[in-house]
Design a protein with these regions (language model features):
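FIC/Doc superfamily catalytic core
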Residues: 1-194, 198-232
Length: 232
């Protein structure tokens, strides 16, 4: 399928979605958010289901068959999404501190302190990594950690400049394209020792919420294809 055909298909699906009034159904936005969270954590190894997350989020009922770490991962990501949506609603500018704050929420109960030759940092506080990381065991190395602060600042400046242009347009395709680009760029920079995938998908959805778009969901069944697309 050509790019033009893909664009036409996307626009047609969006029109159909609006015509059906799906987003106006009772609690639709809440349950869609729960689904985003469930699939995002599943890509990172969580086995908590959407039904289990609904019980956990709404009633505080934990799933006996799931580990505490898995459930905390989901609760933390929910808190991060809720904060992200507040920021998106008021069109807050991107900044390194804003991203670190969201990362701190993502990693609040599953992160920890690291001591390295270059110093100590705490991933549960959203602090940037001070060590090298690779894409899995034996995979290629991500950006040198010394370059991360400047690259992250550059990333924020670029996203802000593009956001401000697009907020005043009806260009749905360019808005989606920026959200996907932000996802890819943040994964490439890999600012944190852990939680980069969840943060990249959160930032993608953050921009989509801000632009009034339907948030993109990376489903767990597409995990292998999704990871390969990031590598390619």
């Amino acid at each position: 399928m050509s790019m033009n055909n893909k664009t036409e298909t996307l626009l047609s699906l969006l029109d159909e979605y609006k015509a059906l009034g799906i987003a106006e159904q009772i609690d639709y936005n809440k349950f869609y958010l729960y689904s985003l969270i469930t699939h995002s954590t599943a890509i990172e190894g969580s086995t908590v289901t959407e039904i289990e997350n609904q019980l956990l989020f709404d009633e505080g009922i934990t799933a006996k068959s799931r580990s505490l770490q898995e459930q905390m991962m989901n609760l933390d990501l929910k808190a991060a999404y809720e904060q992200s949506m507040k920021l998106a609603k008021v069109h807050a500018d991107f900044s390194v501190d804003m991203l670190k704050g969201l990362s701190a929420l993502v990693m609040k109960n599953t992160g920890g302190e690291y001591n390295t030759a270059s110093g100590s940092f705490d991933s549960s506080k959203g602090e940037l990594r001070l060590l090298g990381v690779t894409a899995g065991v034996g995979g290629s190395s991500y950006m040198n950690f010394r370059k991360v602060p400047a690259k992250l600042e550059e990333f924020c400046q670029y996203i802000n400049s593009q956001r401000k242009e697009l907020l005043n347009t009806d260009d749905v395709i360019s808005k989606y394209r920026l959200s996907f680009e932000a996802h890819y760029q943040l994964v490439t920079i890999h600012p944190w020792v852990d939680g980069n995938g969840r943060m990249s998908r959160l930032v993608m959805n953050h921009l989509q919420y801000e632009f009034g778009l339907i948030p993109s969901k990376v489903v767990k069944d597409d995990k292998a294809e999704y990871i390969q697309s990031l590598i390619d």
